[in-house]
């Protein structure tokens, strides 16, 4: 989890280097020795290229599924709302949650909420998806529906970094497995 949070600079690493898609993230130290990003615009660019799916979903409870998915494309990427809605509906179909597009997160199961979180990340058209234990907060019977979506993304050739305890899944869909 800390590794993923360092990749998108939600946590600032104290040493080492981060390179995403060949771009080295420039860091510097202040007069107290604290590390911080040298260029905030570079950090913004990085974050639009990395889709993060959190363990606890982090959906906005006051928004519908559809509103959750279009929020970032409309406000960050400046995608026209009509285009964002069309894209979001296609993604919701893909992750198998379209029929719940007008529901609020509190009316969804954990597996459904996690699929919405995946859809929200996909809506930003990221170069890479970061999954922070995407099934650990789910009831065992709901794990399969989330793994199915992730397996489909892997089969499409999506670059994903997944922190998981689902070792069988990791071995099955990964090109490389790293134990930390």
Describe every region a protein language model picked out.
Residues 129-132:
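Catalytic Walker B motif of ABC-type/P-loop ATPase nucleotide-binding domains
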Residues 63-71:
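Short coil-to-helix segment of the ABC ATPase nucleotide-binding domain corresponding to the Q-loop/switch region
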Residues 164-165:
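H-loop/switch region of ABC-family ATPase nucleotide-binding domains
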Residues 16-31:
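Conserved ABC transporter NBD signature motif
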Residues 140-142:
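Helix N-cap at the start of a conserved alpha-helix in ABC-type nucleotide-binding domains
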Residues 103, 124, 156:
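Conserved signature/switch motifs of ABC ATPase nucleotide-binding domains
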Residues 104-108, 112:
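Conserved ABC ATPase signature
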């Amino acid at each position: 989890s800390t590794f993923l949070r360092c990749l998108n600079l939600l946590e600032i690493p104290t040493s080492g280097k981060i390179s995403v898609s060949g771009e080295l993230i420039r860091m510097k130290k202040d007069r107290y020795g604290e590390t911080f990003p040298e260029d905030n615009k570079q950090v913004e660019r990085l974050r639009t290229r990395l889709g993060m799916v959190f363990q606890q979903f982090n959906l906005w409870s006051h928004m519908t599924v559809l509103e959750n998915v279009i929020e970032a494309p409309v406000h960050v990427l400046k995608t026209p709302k009509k285009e964002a809605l069309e894209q979001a509906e296609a993604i919701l179909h893909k992750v198998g949650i379209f029929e719940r597009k007008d529901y609020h997160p509190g009316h969804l199961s954990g597996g459904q909420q996690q699929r919405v979180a995946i859809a929200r990340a996909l809506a930003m058209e990221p170069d890479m998806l970061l999954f922070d234990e995407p099934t650990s907060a789910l009831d065992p019977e709901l794990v399969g529906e989330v793994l199915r979506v992730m397996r489909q993304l892997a089969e499409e050739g999506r670059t994903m970094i997944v922190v998981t305890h689902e070792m069988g899944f990791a071995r099955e869909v990964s090109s490389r497995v790293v134990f930390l």
